[in-house]
């Protein structure tokens, strides 16, 4: 590798809007903020919202007279 052409790979602190913080390594060089992390994302917490698709289908059928 050529010397002095690669960015510094430093430890940065990532803070989430839910209050969770963790450290990782990055070339960004400064601490940064994210809106969603694994501690608060619905996929990882198991609190997923179920979309009412049956209600939408019924509304469509009533509106267009199908079924």
From Swiss-Prot:
Instruction: Output the PROSITE patterns linked to this UniProt entry.
Output: RIBOSOMAL_L31
Q: What does the record note about the cofactor?
A: Binds 1 zinc ion per subunit.
- Which prosthetic group or cofactor does it need? Zn(2+)
For biological process, the GO terms are: translation
Looking up Pfam families in the UniProt record yields: Ribosomal_L31
As one GO molecular function, the record gives: metal ion binding
Can you name a GO cellular component term? ribonucleoprotein complex
Is DNA-binding there in the keyword field? Answer: no
Is Ribonucleoprotein found in the keyword set? yes
Which keywords are on file for this protein? Metal-binding, Ribonucleoprotein, Ribosomal protein, RNA-binding, rRNA-binding, Zinc
Which positions are annotated as binding Zn(2+)?
A: 16, 18, 37, 40
- Enumerate the InterPro entries for this protein: Ribosomal_bL28/bL31-like_sf (IPR034704), Ribosomal_bL31 (IPR002150), Ribosomal_bL31_A (IPR027491), Ribosomal_bL31_sf (IPR042105)
Which PANTHER family does this entry report, sorted A to Z? 50S RIBOSOMAL PROTEIN L31, CHLOROPLASTIC, LARGE RIBOSOMAL SUBUNIT PROTEIN BL31A
Described purpose of this protein according to its UniProt entry:
Binds the 23S rRNA.
Quaternary structure annotation from Swiss-Prot or TrEMBL: Part of the 50S ribosomal subunit.
What the record says about family reads: Belongs to the bacterial ribosomal protein bL31 family. Type A subfamily.
Which NCBIfam families does the record match to this protein?
L31 (TIGR00105), PRK00019.1 (NF000612), PRK00528.1 (NF001809)
Tell me the protein's name: Large ribosomal subunit protein bL31
Q: Which organism is it from?
A: Methylococcus capsulatus (strain ATCC 33009 / NCIMB 11132 / Bath)
Q: Identify the coding gene.
A: rpmE
